[in-house]
Amino acid sequence: MNTVKSLQEINIAFINDKSPIIDLISNDLLNFGIDILFRSENTKDGLSQLSALKELPKVCIIDLDFYDKNVLAQLQELRTQYPTIKLIAHSDIDAEKAVKPLLEISFDGCLLIGSDADDFRKAIETVINGGRLF
């Protein structure tokens, strides 16, 4: 298995998340050497930004909005179009009913709201190196 030896080798994208908390976490991740290719406000915009890239991110961190009835269909579309991207959910819900659909879509991990930049860094390293985090 090829493991990532340096965080400078990692590029990510944030989808469906433009919060001030993610602003702070993004700055910390940049300080860790992780390159953030883009941040989008919703999944549709994220799909559009992904299609414009020459090099895809290794990881997409997606804030889950379960109030959007189309969220699971949009996530399935994302997985289908970009099967090589590692997907990490960012959610305030850790109930089985929320996590089970993510497993069915083949998400690689889940971080709860309140996770700090170090938690994000560890999750990114885990999924890049073939692990899963739930």
Per-region residue spans from a language model:
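Conserved acidic segment of CheY-like receiver
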Residues: Q8-P20, I25-L29, C60
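C-terminal output helix
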Residues: S115-I124, I128
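Conserved phosphoryl-transfer motifs of two-component systems
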Residues: D108-L111, T126, G131
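Conserved phosphotransfer microenvironments
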Residues: I22, T43-G46, K58-L78, A95
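Two-component signal transduction core modules
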Residues: C60, L87, C110-L111
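As written
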Residues: L102-D108
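Short hydrophobic/Thr-rich beta-strand motif most characteristic of the beta2 strand and flanking loop
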Residues: I34-K44, Q49
